Amino acid sequence: MAIDALFVARGVSLGYGESPVLRDVDLEVREGQYWGWIGPNGSGKSTLLRGFLGLLRPLAGTLEVAPRLTDRARVGYVPQRSELSDALPTTVRELVELGLVRSAVPHSERAAALRWALERTGLTGMERRDVWSLSGGQRQRALVARALVRRPELLVLDEPTEGLDVATQDALLETLGALHREARLTLIVVTHRLEIARERADHVALFLDGRVIAGPRDVVLDSEAARNAFRGPGLALP
């Protein structure tokens, strides 16, 4: 395992019970990379993510995780759907502070970590706003801030643009791009939207029929398998 590798899958099959959802996966995520994991619903994106996060054991092959990432505090995760109840009156500050629970951030540095997370997500000055008074895009940025306040080495986002209008999607993706460039944060964006990977990521994992084609963006998207998969209205590759 290379010194800058965070996750390495070699010949991995993953699934539930004895039925594999993914077969013979080879994929390596390294520090500072921006990954787009693309595929339709049910293609295995979340299954592989669960494997990397230690929530699912492989049926075959080897799955290695950098020792420092076995401490969950080093991984920030933004789920596809917020688990918050709309009956819970939570301010932006209270929501973001939830990310500090069981984190490795020293108590003496938590105020600075909170300010940094709010600043990076464009939420400075909104700390006292009720989460449910925010727009969809602002609420999604608050969830990103909750993950960032832990000072993670890796940020994983599951369908972060789902349900947002185009302008709000673009603003959120610009925020993520700035985090990748300026904070050198490693990103994995799980999505079914081809354009996110094509325009934003530098590495792509394409989930097709139980297999994964993974590597540098242009190599993967120029492959015959990718071109066959994305033929059709609005999906054609350049």
Regions inferred by a protein language model and the residue ranges of each:
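Conserved catalytic motifs of ABC-family nucleotide-binding domains
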Residues: 151
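Catalytic Walker B motif of ABC-type/P-loop ATPase nucleotide-binding domains
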Residues: 155-158
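Conserved ABC ATPase "signature" region
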Residues: 109-126
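Conserved ABC ATPase signature
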Residues: 130-134
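H-loop (His-switch) and adjacent beta-strand-loop-beta switch element
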Residues: 204-216
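H-loop/switch region of ABC-family ATPase nucleotide-binding domains
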Residues: 191-192
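Helix-to-loop junction immediately C-terminal to a conserved catalytic motif
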Residues: 53
